[in-house]
Amino acid sequence: MDNNEILLANPRGFCAGVERAIEIVERALQRFGAPIYVRHEVVHNKFVVDDLRAKGAVFVEELDEVPTGNTVIFSAHGVSQAVREEADKRGLRVFDATCPLVTKVHIEVGRMREQGRELVMIGHKGHPEVEGTMGQVKDGIHLVETAADVANLQVADPDKLAYVTQTTLSVDDAAAIVTALRERFPNIMGPKKDDICYATQNRQDAVKFMTPHADVVFVVGSKNSSNSNRLREVAELRGVPAYLVDNAAGIDPAWIVGKRRIGVTAGASAPEVLVAEVIERLKALSGASVRNLDGVPEKVTFPLPKELQEAR
């Protein structure tokens, strides 16, 4: 099979928020020792979670699973005000690994509600980021998942309305929902800057750039990763078969039969070591060479909590 090629999307994999969240857990373990409790998977990637668990992190879904006097870390997806209050009441030592770009949305929600506006949250029901963002206020916030949902929205005052979005949505889907909102509520207020984060946008753009040149696309990421699922959808919407795989073992050789150009990308919570393993497996199956595609360089970094900045 001559001239087979593996196309590597750029950028791909870890974003600044994920790197920060993982480092918070690792530094807390170094500084305070195991166990360190983490509310929800710190990022949605099985490999990362299993690795941190092996180092002494204990993942829980609710704070009542954390013994009094222990340390708890909030995941990158953010938490509601009720969770913060519960941690405070319990006297737990808290490190907040919420992505700063999610925190930005939390601040927007609080500010808009203080101005007396009702809010529309564009996002996926049940996703922890959505639950955390909607839980910034006690009432006056509605969830919309599709443009069709907009028609059923019941609001008190159409002129006192604002919207925010989950940070990991499909850029195109979110734009369609915003268009529907503006058509129905012309005076709706949006965020000064789009809530969909730079990493989500860049990774989706990289897949759009890659798909015209690819016969099949592999997205390295876990099934519960919102941004990874969106990358798969972006490829599929452009008529290219796409598969979400946790690792190299998830690849079915039948998927690349007759495919000369194989695209590879990774979600924002997928480590590069898994991408490397996927590439090696694809090379072994297809005899393909690897070509790195051009993309937007990312130089974003987020500071760690002060108490953990010195921990090594």
Swiss-Prot record:
Q: Which CDD domains match?
A: lytB_ispH
Q: Which InterPro entries match?
A: LytB/IspH
Active-site residues per Swiss-Prot or TrEMBL entry: E129 (proton donor)
Q: Which Pfam families match?
A: LYTB
Q: Which residues bind dimethylallyl diphosphate?
A: H44, H77, H127, S225, S226, N227, S269
Q: Which reaction does it catalyse?
A: isopentenyl diphosphate + 2 oxidized [2Fe-2S]-[ferredoxin] + H2O = (2E)-4-hydroxy-3-methylbut-2-enyl diphosphate + 2 reduced [2Fe-2S]-[ferredoxin] + 2 H(+); dimethylallyl diphosphate + 2 oxidized [2Fe-2S]-[ferredoxin] + H2O = (2E)-4-hydroxy-3-methylbut-2-enyl diphosphate + 2 reduced [2Fe-2S]-[ferredoxin] + 2 H(+)
Indicate whether 4Fe-4S appears among the record's keywords.
Answer: yes
Protein family:
Belongs to the IspH family.
Under the heading PANTHER family, the entry gives:
4-HYDROXY-3-METHYLBUT-2-ENYL DIPHOSPHATE REDUCTASE
Protein name per Swiss-Prot or TrEMBL? 4-hydroxy-3-methylbut-2-enyl diphosphate reductase
Q: Which organism is it from?
A: Azoarcus sp. (strain BH72)
Q: Which gene encodes it?
A: ispH
